[in-house]
């Protein structure tokens, strides 16, 4: 029987499945950070249980960390407690930790792939909703809750029901300057923020194959923003070339054997999906969100929609509420909307290619008066590479702030946040009310679009910036 990639991955990891019961899956990799793990480790301690597979468990600090200092005491009391707990727990249970002073420290979904912890064919979980990022490698990766974190630590397994399957095919080639972020925002604009609910999405088509691994990670990172359980891209030569030689990747003959298996991780011809969505890549232009969920998105040169234009009363009410919160009026152009802050970073867009794209726009220009612009690399290795290429100097000379690795302004859990009423062009993944700070107004864009907003002081079409 022909199977989809998701079905192959799921079936290969079923440890036990009793009739009429939820299957028990084996978990190959468990990624841990300071926010969703303390109670899980406390649960192990209370029951006298060890971590079953410490060698398959990897921890880092990211959500709460300061991006201005490596001093743990400068991060606020709750953050300090959570980070100190992670240090204690990892030491006690024998889990490898990339702490604030480790050269590999960074956002968990940046660290995993760049260290070769993430590999095709694996099941990967983390107490974080954007774990879907790792699906870019042809791995089944999804976020879990704290009680599930404890279960995986204790058993290296997890009960999971089978999801429905969705194929999203982006046909043809994207125009120059159109990034994975624009593609995924256009997809969510078409499906809506709940269009993938109950599904695992496989992204395919020429435009997807043309993406680098970093672009594919951006794509899968935001699968959750259309309500999907996970996102997948089938592995290919792009994947294998990225993985080869990384710290935890197989070496020598083991790598060759792994590649032979990874090449089987494709959806079979004739396999059926529950839902199919198709887009034409050449129709996608630079995207900017205007509302308070990622599905409320338009091309940069389009007018903000009138809520009255939505046939669905729920969508109409949502649009009215979003415009009121965002301080916007129907019919205006986003290119006429001034911004206060710019954030280039997050598990969506903080990798070296993202920083190069932003630096290309920033080079020889200056951040507009009254705008604060932050560039936050996703990890120590990304920061080091960017500095080796001189990207930090480009940003600093242009008036951007060059920060230490961390989740930063993606979420209001650390010192980087918006003040009430401030408007931000952000490369992150969520534009919910209050996501970047109480009363803050978030617009999601690509790194190049964020840099363009920084130097012009408003949203701008990068295709017009020479």
UniProtKB/Swiss-Prot annotation:
Which annotated residues bind [4Fe-4S] cluster? 347, 407, 410
**GO: which molecular function terms?**
3-isopropylmalate dehydratase activity; 4 iron, 4 sulfur cluster binding; metal ion binding
Q: Which InterPro entries match?
A: 3-IsopropMal_deHydase_lsu (IPR004430), Acnase/IPM_dHydase_lsu_aba_1/3 (IPR015931), Acoase/IPM_deHydtase_lsu_aba (IPR001030), Aconitase_4Fe-4S_BS (IPR018136), Aconitase_4Fe-4S_dom (IPR036008), IPM_dehydratase_rel_enz (IPR050067), IPMI_cat (IPR033941)
* Cofactor(s) recorded in Swiss-Prot or TrEMBL: [4Fe-4S] cluster
Give the GO biological process terms. L-leucine biosynthetic process
PROSITE patterns, alphabetically?
Answer: ACONITASE_1, ACONITASE_2
List the SUPFAM superfamilies hit by this protein, alphabetically.
Aconitase iron-sulfur domain
Give the pathway listed in the UniProt entry for this protein. Answer: Amino-acid biosynthesis; L-leucine biosynthesis; L-leucine from 3-methyl-2-oxobutanoate: step 2/4
Record Pfam families: Aconitase
EC numbers on record: 4.2.1.33
What reaction gets catalysed by this protein?
A: (2R,3S)-3-isopropylmalate = (2S)-2-isopropylmalate
Alphabetically sorted, this entry's keywords are: 4Fe-4S, Amino-acid biosynthesis, Branched-chain amino acid biosynthesis, Iron, Iron-sulfur, Leucine biosynthesis, Lyase, Metal-binding
- Binding note for cofactor: Binds 1 [4Fe-4S] cluster per subunit.
Q: Which domain of life is it from?
A: Bacteria
Family that this chain belongs to: Belongs to the aconitase/IPM isomerase family. LeuC type 1 subfamily.
NCBIfam families from the UniProt entry: leuC, PRK05478.1, PRK12466.1
**Function, in words:** Catalyzes the isomerization between 2-isopropylmalate and 3-isopropylmalate, via the formation of 2-isopropylmaleate.
Per UniProt, subunit arrangement is: Heterodimer of LeuC and LeuD.
> PANTHER family annotated for this entry?
3-ISOPROPYLMALATE DEHYDRATASE, HOMOACONITASE, MITOCHONDRIAL-RELATED
Q: Which HAMAP family match?
A: LeuC_type1 (MF_01026)
Query: What name has this protein been given in UniProt?
Result: 3-isopropylmalate dehydratase large subunit
Organism (species): Escherichia coli O157:H7
Biological classification of the source: Bacteria, Pseudomonadati, Pseudomonadota, Gammaproteobacteria, Enterobacterales
> What gene makes this protein?
leuC
